[in-house]
């Protein structure tokens, strides 16, 4: 048994979609979450800068004595996950491979779409992972740089959000049967995305898919939390306005949380 927390990092609030699923599946596990909303979005930034920012988030989580780190950010996973994983002696998990694997299982026509930040799409990592496991699957990737700012400003239900999603996704409509939400912010726009793509298109939440892998690693390294603990204390940190973070988090997690400001 290991009662230390699992650390989550993201460029902002998007990683809460992963946290929500973890709380549902593994309610006995403690969480420490750091969202770098002050510098979001990461997607348009140069690789070197993304690596620097990611390491700052990692080092912050290490000061919290976490037992595992989850990259709840596709951009950080694409750019820095392998380097961080090789450097640390605790498990480090990314969201891309679980999302790619789920897409392969989902598609019936071999037509998969991937939406993500400009950096994630430019890295071509989803196509590489999917076609490594299933070479016959066709992958269409599309950068959606306007989605993260919508979420970070808590405008997911606005008319402008609907227009941006519609305009952004139009190149994929009618061409795929499975769509990977290749950014953990995007599930917060899920109802609009589903409406645009149509009910027959299966949406894959890459962040939620990785919770299964978290459970596997906890068992493999024998670092599960206390199954009998009914109430666990989570900690949430943001580099931006805690009130905005708290507002979005409370809606998504369906509970009120305390959010602390941190300067990296």
UniProtKB/Swiss-Prot annotation:
Its EC number is 5.1.1.3. InterPro entries: Asp/Glu/hydantoin_racemase, Asp/Glu_race, Asp/Glu_racemase_AS_2, Glu_race. This is Glutamate racemase. The active site is at 73 (proton donor/acceptor), 183 (proton donor/acceptor). PROSITE patterns: ASP_GLU_RACEMASE_2 (PS00924). GO terms for biological process: cell wall organization; peptidoglycan biosynthetic process; regulation of cell shape. Pfam families: Asp_Glu_race (PF01177). One of its GO terms (molecular function) is glutamate racemase activity. Keywords: Cell shape, Cell wall biogenesis/degradation, Isomerase, Peptidoglycan synthesis. It comes from Streptococcus pyogenes serotype M2 (strain MGAS10270). Belongs to the aspartate/glutamate racemases family. Provides the (R)-glutamate required for cell wall biosynthesis. Pathway: Cell wall biogenesis; peptidoglycan biosynthesis. Substrate binds at residues 10-11, 42-43, 74-75, 184-185.
């Amino acid at each position: 048994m290991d009662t230390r927390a699992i650390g989550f990092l993201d460029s902002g609030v998007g990683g809460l979609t992963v946290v929500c699923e973890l709380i549902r599946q593994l309610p006995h596990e403690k969480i420490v979450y750091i969202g770098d909303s002050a510098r979001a979005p990461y997607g348009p930034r140069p690789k070197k800068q993304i690596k620097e920012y990611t390491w700052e988030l990692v080092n912050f989580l290490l000061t919290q004595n976490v037992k595992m780190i989850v990259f709840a950010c596709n951009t950080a996973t694409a750019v820095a996950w392998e380097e961080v994983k090789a450097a640390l002696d605790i498990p480090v998990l990314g969201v891309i491979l679980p999302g790619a694997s789920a897409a392969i299982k989902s598609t019936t026509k071999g037509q998969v779409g991937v939406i993500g930040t400009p950096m994630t799409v430019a890295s071509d990592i989803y196509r590489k992972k999917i076609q490594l496991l299933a070479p016959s699957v066709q992958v269409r990737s599309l950068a959606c740089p306007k989605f993260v700012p919508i979420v970070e400003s808590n405008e997911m239900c606005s008319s402008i959000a609907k227009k941006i999603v519609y305009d952004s996704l139009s190149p994929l409509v009618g061409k795929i049967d499975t769509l990977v939400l290749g950014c953990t912010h995007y599930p917060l726009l899920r109802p609009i995305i589903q409406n645009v793509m149509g009910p027959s298109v299966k949406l894959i939440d890459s962040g939620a898919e990785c919770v299964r892998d978290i459970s596997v690693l906890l068992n493999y390294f024998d670092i599960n939390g206390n199954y009998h603990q009914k109430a666990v204390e989570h900690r949430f940190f943001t580099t931006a306005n805690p009130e905005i973070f708290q507002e979005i988090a409370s809606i998504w997690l369906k509970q009120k949380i305390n959010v602390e400001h941190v300067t990296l």
